């Protein structure tokens, strides 16, 4: 029913790792214009939406659109077996009702094949979130990762407070405190503030956002007061990943 050839195996490792971190399984949609995935954590505090347009694949052939539930943990294990010389080929095995993942070495020509059985076929249509954040900023992925690692040293929660001209990230616990004041031209690549905002997020949930950093240079972060945070990655070939983090009432 479909055959997809993806040449950026190193990038897919970051993608698969992120999806598996949120949940062991998720909905995958193979449509005429691209591959999409929708993964929500069991406690509903985090959500990942992946979009890989057909042009991001070397070969993209879908005869009939379909949605299936697949094990993201199995995809993650398989992606770890890929080398930088491997193409990743996705095909649907109708007889086994499974996703066939082939790792084909471009230089040597040999292949390794794996099967990921579908938990279910014909899953519900994926829903998109409609949020209205009041703050958006862009930051280098390395700086985002450093920030979250800093917070981990201090506490379990991070407070984000934005006002005109700056975003301040704070954390505190057991007589330890952390604060990072970020401004455009300093750390922030861009900043838009429609309304001052303050919200707290779990550090454990935020750590999920560090998984794709090796595949993108910058990331867009959006939030509002006591409102879900959206973290958006755009990769070089048009792939996109949106991560949504629920605010925390603790902290």
Curated annotation (Swiss-Prot):
A single Pfam family it belongs to is PCNA_N
User: Origin organism of this chain?
Assistant: Aeropyrum pernix (strain ATCC 700893 / DSM 11879 / JCM 9820 / NBRC 100138 / K1)
Q: Which GO terms describe its biological process?
A: leading strand elongation; regulation of DNA replication
Source domain of life is: Archaea
Protein name per UniProt: DNA polymerase sliding clamp 2
**NCBIfam families membership:** PRK01115.1-1
Which keywords annotate this record? DNA replication, DNA-binding
Q: List the disulfide bonds.
A: none
């Amino acid at each position: 029913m479909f055959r997809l050839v993806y040449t950026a195996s190193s990038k897919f490792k970051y993608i698969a790792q992120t999806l598996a971190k949120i949940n062991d399984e998720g909905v995958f949609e193979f449509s005429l214009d691209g591959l999409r995935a929708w993964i929500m954590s069991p406690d509903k505090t985090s959500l990942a939406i992946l979009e890989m347009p057909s042009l991001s694949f070397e070969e993209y052939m879908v005869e009939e659109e379909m949605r299936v539930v697949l094990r993201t943990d199995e995809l993650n294990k398989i992606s770890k077996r890929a080398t930088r010389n491997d193409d990743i080929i996705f095909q649907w095995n109708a007889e086994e009702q499974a996703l066939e993942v082939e790792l084909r070495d471009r230089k040597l020509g040999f292949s390794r094949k794996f099967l990921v059985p579908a938990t279910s076929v014909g899953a519900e249509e994926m829903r998109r979130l409609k949020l209205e954040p009041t703050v958006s900023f862009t930051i280098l992925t390395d700086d985002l990762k450093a920030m979250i690692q800093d917070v981990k040293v201090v506490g379990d929660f991070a407070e984000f407070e934005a006002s005109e001209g700056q975003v301040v990230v704070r954390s505190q616990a057991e007589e330890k405190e952390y604060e990072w004041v970020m401004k455009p031209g300093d750390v922030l690549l861009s900043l838009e503030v429609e309304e001052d905002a303050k919200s707290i997020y779990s550090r454990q949930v935020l750590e999920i956002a560090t998984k794709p950093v090796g595949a993108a240079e910058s990331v867009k972060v959006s939030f509002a007061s006591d409102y879900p945070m959206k973290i958006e990655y755009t990769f070089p070939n048009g792939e996109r990943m949106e991560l949504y983090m629920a605010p925390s009432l603790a902290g």
